[in-house]
């Protein structure tokens, strides 16, 4: 049978699960419902995923691992910290904005506190540490508080999408990144330069594509 999404059976399952988890919640969604939405038998689902938890883990890590990869690259890049921070904020916000089913809204599901999701939490910690390092370099002291503020701003797009699905667009990530620089006391003049240089950094990322220009 042809894949409904063109992503293969595993991709079909993730696509269906993302939609159902976001609409109904994790606990209220059965593997039977996921399989039915993916166009396969429930027994076939277990050839690709051992459990519903594994499906959720794949979805959650997919919202973080690309940003972690970007953060690693930016930390090793020779450029002003403010520009690298802008680039990371814009990339991270874009990933959350463009996620089809707003999977980031599942971060606070109580099931995610389980040890099974340690890989996801480890990625989140690494991403937070990358933000903290860039903020220290860009703003000096007060890194702990500022890191939480910046991450809160970036991830606010999750709630914005939930409240008003049409309230975010291709310009939102750049606006979020601009706002993050103001939170860490970057001056208006330096912020403009950081925006320009950060946009250049995004386009030059090895795993970027030309569509990144949409957030500039």
Show the residue positions of the predicted features.
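Amphipathic alpha-helical packing segments from all-alpha helical-bundle domains
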Residues: 68, 113-151, 171-174, 178
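A short secondary-structure junction motif
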Residues: 66-70, 96-99, 103, 134, ...
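Hydrophobic alpha-helical connector segments
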Residues: 58, 69-98
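Hydrophobic alpha-helical segments that form the core
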Residues: 94, 141-184, 194-205
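N-terminal intrinsically disordered/low-complexity leader segments
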Residues: 1-8, 190-216
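Helix-turn-helix
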Residues: 12, 16, 20-58
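Amphipathic alpha-helical segments used for helix-helix packing
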Residues: 84, 93-118, 147-152, 159, ...
